[in-house]
Amino acid sequence: MNSYVNMGVGALLGTVFVLMSVSIASEGIFHAPAPEKEGYTIVAAESGGGEAGGGEAAAAATPIAKLLASADAAKGEAVFKKCTSCHTGESGGANKVGPNLFDVVNRPIASHEGFSYSAGMKDFSKGASVHWDYDHLNYFLEAPKKHVPGTAMGFAGVKKETERADLIAYLRSLSANPAPLPDPNAAPAPMN
């Protein structure tokens, strides 16, 4: 072998030796033992109280009956403008992406004629035996997909309690015979 080949092989072996030495040294310096259980533990404070389901417990902070006692249907009409891209509210109004909401309070859920409801909404309605009472409207309008899993409604919800109460008061007014307001001292109905 000539000296140029010996120099090349020596340089290659020297480089491999240096890299291996650095690797072994850094493994010794920066060694991290394997965890007993893979993953990270995230410690977070529990939010809101009580029942599983969170959204229902949070919405129950102030019962809708108490909020409706001071709700303003005129303010609710302004909130309803968010809904008009998908819903109508006049008597005999057409269905859009969502059903017409005239006389919706106390109407059986998923029962409006001429509208094709999602499977999630039909399941939730239990064959139209569940009604849009004030509590169901309150929980649904807070977070539609959380209250009715599988609903096709793409609206994120109305987070502020007072805005929801105003909107429900306005929806109540969309009727020839508005449903009576609930007793503000009554306990909220349990959600299924």
Swiss-Prot record:
The chain crosses the membrane at residues 8-25. It is found in: Cell membrane. Residues 1-7 are cytoplasmic. Binds 1 heme c group covalently per subunit. InterPro entries: Cyt_c-like_dom, Cyt_c-like_dom_sf, Cyt_c_1A/1B. It comes from Agrobacterium fabrum (strain C58 / ATCC 33970) (Agrobacterium tumefaciens (strain C58)). One of its GO terms (molecular function) is metal ion binding. Keywords: Cell membrane, Electron transport, Heme, Iron, Membrane, Metal-binding, Signal-anchor, Transmembrane, Transmembrane helix, Transport. Heme c binds at C83, C86, H87, M153. The keyword Heme applies. This is Cytochrome c homolog.
